[in-house]
Amino acid sequence: MKQAIWGGVALALLAVTTARAETRMFSYDPISPDAKRLTGAGVTILFNQGLLGSGRPVKVLATGVPAEARLRDGRQKDLGPGGLAAMDGVDADAMLFEVDAKAAQGKVYVRAFCPGSTRLWLSFSTIAIRRDLRIQAFGDDPNAEAPNGEKKARLCGTLDFSYRGEWRLPGGGPPDPNEDWTDTLNGPR
């Protein structure tokens, strides 16, 4: 009986957390050499923030040009044996996502961030207001194999950014970063 009650409470909390998720968008300026080289003017991250505070990234947007990478959950095992924990110089506790190469400009991001790779994973430090961000890029490496013959991903770059600010999003749904929202300032289209 107690298990059923606790299960119900957990389910209710999950429903409340999901219902309260808020879509937000933060912009960041590049500070590391890799970030400056790969992003130019920086990045803007569209993410969902739950009640527990940390954000789950949905899209990475180039701040200076209309290019976006849609993200999906990344799997540690796709990086090779041990995942992030087995790589040197990597934050093993970071959130891992894979760039969807078939959506938007995903292929462009794969080629730019990890030349020669066909897949791109991005790990994110905690996304929070007024907090700097670290993104590490990983690509599949056709020439690298683990001792047991499995494929192994490689670290392509460590991108450090300083927090710039938050975009005010229009109400009623997620924003379209490629849409000129200033068109609506002079009345309906």
What annotation goes with each model-predicted range?
Residues 92-188:
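Beta-strand-rich cores of mature extracytoplasmic or soluble domains
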Residues 17-21:
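Sec/Tat signal peptide C-region and signal peptidase I cleavage site
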Residues 45, 53-56, 74-78, 123-136, ...:
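Structured catalytic/translocation cores of nucleotide/phosphate-coupled proteins
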Residues 1-7:
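Bacterial N-terminal signal peptides that target proteins for export
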Residues 24-25, 30-63, 111-125, 180, ...:
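Short, solvent-exposed loop/hinge segments that bridge or flank secondary-structure elements
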Residues 7-15:
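Bacterial N-terminal signal peptides
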Residues 36, 57-124:
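Contiguous, well-ordered beta-strand patches that form the walls/edges
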